[in-house]
Amino acid sequence: MTTSARDTGLDSHELARLHELARHSHAVITRHQDAGGAYPAAPTFSAYRGYAWLRDGSFTAEGISRYGDVASAGRFHDWVDGVLRRRRGQVDDLLAAVDRGEVPSNEGMLPTRFTFDGNDGSDPWWDFQTDGYGMWLWSVVTHAARHGLDLERWRAGIDVAVDYLLAFWDRPCYDWWEEHVEHRHVSTLGAIHGGLVAVGTCAALRSAPWSAATLQVAARIRSLVSAEGVVDGHLVKWLGSSAVDGSLPACVVPFGLVPPDDDVAAMTRAAVAKDLDVDGGVHRFAADVFYGGGQWILLSALLGWNLAAAGDTAGALRHLRWIADQADADGDLPEQVPHHLLHPGSRAEWVARWGTVATPLLWSHGMYLILADELGLLPPAAKDA
């Protein structure tokens, strides 16, 4: 439930600062949105330049939708729909291979990121990741419900994403961080669950031929994670692991794999906070060496979002304030910050390889908008953007 700004106890100066970062976040996202609708992950970062991820974009679109910019979010969903329509034949070929008893190669699966014109691109990447397809289903259904839009506009793309996930939801793949292709990751399963439940419970999609199957698979995901993805009362990084990951709160909010008031949800929030939260900034996982293993803006917002949903307004506000403190002189938010590094000795090699940390990261700005909205801290005119 969204909090009112008056419940946060902020003075006028801090409220103005948080409002200004929200306005800037909207401006950064929309300024860099491609003419075709894609949200670039990070417009100037060497390894991301020229590409858009469904994962980053789905959360970014949610932030923009909450801000009230229906047109910008709609253009992103138009872009994804168009990309997936053009992948109809590829998915049909994959499904036919499965029907023949074949196991398609990872290289034959849909990619996790696309060029702005919807192609795979020529740069090698850790491309087989299924989470973004579930995230997009959740994002587009949520956007349509919020603003009273007709999902027929995106129905062809929805069909492709659903068919793909129903066939390959339980296949090991790379995780949110593009690592460990050999495992089935709980945050990936959570994202798929969220997408399948979103379309399966949507009244406007009830007549779809896959409607019942989406909820059946979602139930199978819940059973699987309950049996193999919970250790010491909390969700874990992958099935069979005991470690936590900063992405795990997404399995609670927004993806509903575990209800927010469930003991597993509370234990997961607590485990992530204990192992990964330092002064309001959340790390990805304990073994993270990427740029030294810093604190990620988007994960701090994700934990804050979950705390807000659980009724911990003070805890959520702590994360929002921390995020606001990380903005650079231009107001831009990076992917991660180096104030507390888990493995500082590894930072230099990544700087040498790819340059300085991605800034701005549109996903960071989108997550700020989401958390600000949860706390009732979007600027008064934002909903009319």
Curated annotation (Swiss-Prot):
Q: How does activity depend on temperature?
A: Optimum temperature is under 35 degrees Celsius.
Instruction: Give GO terms for biological process.
Output: polysaccharide catabolic process
Q: What class of enzyme is it?
A: hydrolase
**UniProt-annotated catalytic positions:** 175, 178, 335
Q: Does the keyword Hydrolase apply?
A: yes
Task: Identify this protein by name.
Answer: Isomaltose glucohydrolase
What is the phylogenetic placement of the source species in the record?
Bacteria, Bacillati, Actinomycetota, Actinomycetes, Propionibacteriales
What Gene Ontology cellular-component terms does the record carry? Answer: cytoplasm
